[in-house]
């Protein structure tokens, strides 16, 4: 193999090794993004900054795995946090002008989210 070929192989190898690994979204990120929505979802406060968090979450959940993780976190929160208006939770994406491929509900089957 000539020297130029070896250099090309080395450069490609370095690019593969140095490529950053994309990490999946976490429940911490999901809850952090949606924390401003809690008062609204409990009927105790305005929508306020909630939609900014919803939009940030949608932008963060780019892969199927991310969307399934986000769905699972939201499903768990919807069932565990007392006083949440589940109708408002389900309508949150449309209220904020975004689309998500699942309903925010304790009954959502997150394994089917694409």
From Swiss-Prot:
Pfam families, per the entry: Tryp_alpha_amyl
InterPro entries per record: Bifun_inhib/LTP/seed_sf, Bifunc_inhib/LTP/seed_store, Plant_nsLTP
Recorded GO MF terms: lipid binding
UniProt keyword terms in alphabetical order: Disulfide bond, Lipid-binding, Pathogenesis-related protein, Plant defense, Signal, Transport
Distribution of this protein across tissues and organs: High expression in leaf epidermis and shoot apex, and also in root epidermis during seedling germination.
Annotated SUPFAM superfamilies: Bifunctional inhibitor/lipid-transfer protein/seed storage 2S albumin
Disulphide bond pairs: 27-73, 37-50, 51-96, 71-110
Entry's Gene Ontology BP terms: defense response; lipid transport
Leader peptide range in chain numbering: 1-23
Family matches, as SMART domains: AAI
Described function: Plant non-specific lipid-transfer proteins transfer phospholipids as well as galactolipids across membranes. Binds cis-unsaturated fatty acids and jasmonic acid with a higher affinity than linear chain fatty acids. Formation of the complex with jasmonic acid results in a conformational change facilitating the LPT1 binding on the elicitin plasma membrane receptor that is known to be involved in plant defense induction. May also play a role in wax or cutin deposition in the cell walls of expanding epidermal cells and certain secretory tissues.
Sequence similarity: Belongs to the plant LTP family.
Protein name from the UniProt record: Non-specific lipid-transfer protein 1
């Amino acid at each position: 193999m000539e020297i130029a070929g070896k250099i090309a192989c080395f450069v490609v190898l370095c690019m593969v090794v140095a490529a950053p690994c994309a990490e999946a979204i976490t429940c911490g990120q999901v809850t952090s993004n949606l924390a401003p929505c809690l008062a609204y979802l409990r009927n105790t406060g305005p929508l306020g900054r909630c939609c900014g968090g919803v939009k940030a979450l949608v932008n963060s959940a780019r892969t199927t795995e991310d969307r399934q993780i986000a769905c699972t976190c939201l499903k768990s929160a919807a069932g565990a946090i007392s006083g949440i208006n589940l109708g408002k939770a389900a309508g949150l994406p449309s209220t904020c002008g975004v689309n998500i491929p699942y309903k925010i509900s304790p009954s959502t089957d997150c394994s089917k989210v694409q």
